[in-house]
Amino acid sequence: MAPKPPKSPKGQKKGKKNMKQQLLVPEEEEPMNMESMGHPEIYPLVLTTKTQEIFNCRVDEDMTDEQTYKLIKKEDILADLQNRAAVSDFHPVKKIVREYPGEELLLVYDKDFKYGLNFYLIGTEDGKENFLKPPEVPEEQEEPKEHVQEDVYVYNPPVSKPWVSLGSEKEIEEESVQESGKRVTYMISRKRSEFGAPVTFSDQNASSVKDAYIECTSYPEKNYTLSQVEKDVGLQVIAEVKDTSTQTKWAFPKNATTQYYPREFSEEEKSLIGKSKSLVDFFNNVSTSVEVALQQNEIMNTFIDDWKNLAEEESTFGDKTDTHLKEYQSFTDLHNTMEKMITCVSWHPTIFGLIVVSVAVRLSYEERVQNSGRLLLQPSLLLFWSFSDPIHPQLMLESPDDIFCFEFCPSDPNIIAGGCINGQIVLWDITAHADRIENIKTGGHRSKKTSLKPMFLLEPDSNKESMYIRHCAVSSIENGHRKVITDIHWLPDSFEINRMGSVFENRSGINCQLVTCSADCTICFWDIRPQKPAVTAAAAASAATTATNNANSQQSPVEKKKEENIDIPFDVPSTFLHLDLSWKPLSRLKLSKGDTSLDHCPTKLSLGEDPFLCKIQGTSSIHIILRDKMLSQIKMVKTSEINPYQNLEAGIANILKPIEDFCTKFFVGTEEGEVIYTDWKMERDSDTGRLMAKKPVSLYTVHDGAVHTIQRSPFFNDIVLTVGGWNVAIWKEEVMTGPLLQTCCGPKRYTAGHWSLTRPGVFYIGREDGNVDIWDLLEKTHEPAQSQNICITMITYIKPWTFSSKQQFIAVADYYGTLHILEIPWTLSHPSLNEVSSVNYYFEREVRHLEYVQQRKEIREQEKIDMALELVKKKAKIYQKTKEQMEAELKLEYESYLDLEKSVLFALGLSKVSEKKSYLDSH
């Protein structure tokens, strides 16, 4: 808004005269000229295309490099000023044009913008004449200049003059750095008693002495504020918004109901209408359209809203911007006085909200030997934790020693197999207690809608008393592992193997075999079915039975029955009674270190997982179908009268043909950080005839510590994640050139890891400082996408679990025996569009990169071999000299000898003048 004009003095009214004076003010302003550059007669102008056409001075047409000026009549310029007024481009020089004495003004085209604009006007007659006719220097004046003698330069020494301040010293002072505070002065001296004593210096660690090293780290200045330069403020005067409503008062309430029913045809009318020609013709006409519509409904949903499907699901529990794991619940065994750590974690396959952990005493081997008597008083347990009761375990499974690994049977979750620290395998059967833990899941009368909202907030009811359950079978101590079992897996129910490692079809349809690895450098395969006895063994058994009966003929049958019943406790199921203390491995595999007599020490292994087992945790439609299929099979086992594990029969692999095209290779991680890809098939030694393991297909020393995790991706069966030491690696099966991804050394040692169950490019890594690194291959491949602190001690195990498409949990176990249940945020549980194909493309690109590196390596090695051969050839080549060259060399050598002889004789004063002869003349 323009400011108001000031009022006229003495209250005079503003009239037209004053307005005219105000309008004439801008015309009286002097136009801009080039007086500062020494040309006061030049006035720069900007001529638009319209003006150039009016005065015929168009650029590159009328005005060129040869013709750079034009004479314009004064009358034409004044006419243009009168017609276009202030719009005219000559308006800034209106005063100059009017006062110009001549009839024509000179307009010059300024192509190089020497004076800032594209044209300039010469406002004086002298300037016009000087431009059109520049003064020429006569030749007579130029010639004497050539003969003028140049001035001789005389050096004048500088003389000091008084300094005149022009303001530059202020700028120098502003740019200079000056100390604002006083310096702190320290005086360090020795004791007076040590004056004059010899001084000896030595190295000292700054961290070992208190207050020996003080670090001054940088930090952001809190007092720094950014001044606000501009601010947009809007104001509007409106009335306040008011909410008003009206409602008719219901003075006399009255209950009333109305019911409608359709009018129906009678039986006669129905028969007549059904036989009518119009109805038949109608069905004949529309039958084709109805069939097409039904086919379309079978092919695709024609009523789907594609626009809504472009967006991702909004109905989630957390915020999409939240990327951190949230603590949901934690479990700690408060009843055990011994300090224990969690060694293994597994979610129940069918009961949501039930998680099982194994605990072990935090003692070394020497400490275990010293405290062996105390350890016998504390039972080794598997704890069943429920979200409804975080204090009391629901079940506690006893074992002969601490369990370091266990796994649920995929065919029947009531069967659990575990590996002990003493090398024994333990089997539990909790079928008799299945109702107890299933009732915990339902938690009384609860609706389906309630179970989907903050889950597992259940009343513990009468489940506060923990129940101890004994194992039903353990393996033989003499024939099993000698050291701690580090990993255990159930073989898929689709196949079984024999003692040679050959693969056969498993027609029983249930999981009957296990594989274990131990620190005693062995990998064992186990079969839970009874072995079929041979004829000789049966005869020996019958003979032994006869001898026993003869020796115990004095005992009555009743006493014998009592003795047999005493050996079997009443609370132990007889499912695997045939294995107890007599269970032997089906085959034993040792990974030899080549020429030496030592063997590799396996810590983790990964078989070729069955797709039905590895994809059961997905959230897509096929995953839901597979999960429902597994649950239906388990339900059929429960409803059937006979459990298939109650009446196990010996395998029929001996009468079947082996499967030839089955992949029998698997990954093994060792204690030295090696990743081995080997075959479990055995071969006979040609010298000794004994069964031996095949040579490993490939061996890589990637990790600088023991391998803690080997796991296949739930989305790509040939992609394997390995965690050990200070780094992480991702491998692809059948790719022998190396890992697809190998991270750099982390800040702390890695102790656990697991793939995400719903995002193919995400995996979780646990560290020894209690942090969890979350890797996202689509975001970063050189470092974790984010890192979050979970506890203050080492993380020992990580296990995620998907409850529904909206909620996902991850269990993190630590060294102090605490199990942390964390809720995974929306961004880490929901894959992006085409994430599977994007991650697959990344792996394929890395495979091509490895192939290229291998090709370059082979080419470089071949180049080195070729260069070595060429060097050998050059050295072996003998240079043959000609006769003339040999004579010339001898001549030079003889002449140098004569010169030396002459110099020696001359130095001794025995020199004689003699004619020098050549070497050829002397001969």
From Swiss-Prot:
Keywords: Coiled coil, Cytoplasm, Repeat, WD repeat. WD repeats lie at residues 398-438, 480-536, 702-741, 745-785. One of its GO terms (biological process) is positive regulation of osteoblast differentiation. This is Dynein axonemal intermediate chain 3. It is found in: Cytoplasm. Residues 10-19 have a biased composition (Basic residues). GO terms for cellular component: axonemal dynein complex; cytoplasm. One of its GO terms (molecular function) is Arp2/3 complex binding. Acts as a negative regulator of cell migration, invasion, and metastasis downstream of p53/TP53, through inhibition of Arp2/3 complex-mediated actin polymerization. Via its association with the multisubunit axonemal dynein complex, is potentially involved in the regulation of cilia function. May play a role in osteogenesis of dental tissue-derived mesenchymal stem cells. Interacts with ACTR2; this interaction reduces binding of the Arp2/3 complex to the VCA domain of nucleation promoting factors. Part of the multisubunit axonemal dynein complex formed at least of two heavy chains and a number of intermediate and light chains. Found in a associated with the catalytic heavy chain DNAH2, the intermediate chain DNAI4, and the light chain DYNLT1. Disruption phenotype: Deficient mice shown no overt abnormalities in body size, development, behavior, or fertility. Disulfide bonds: none annotated. Residues 1-35 are annotated as: Disordered. It comes from the Eukaryota. Strongly expressed in the testes. Detected also in brain and lung tissues. PANTHER family: DYNEIN AXONEMAL INTERMEDIATE CHAIN 3, DYNEIN INTERMEDIATE CHAIN. The keyword Chaperone does not apply. Residues 869-889 form a coiled coil. It comes from Mus musculus (Mouse).
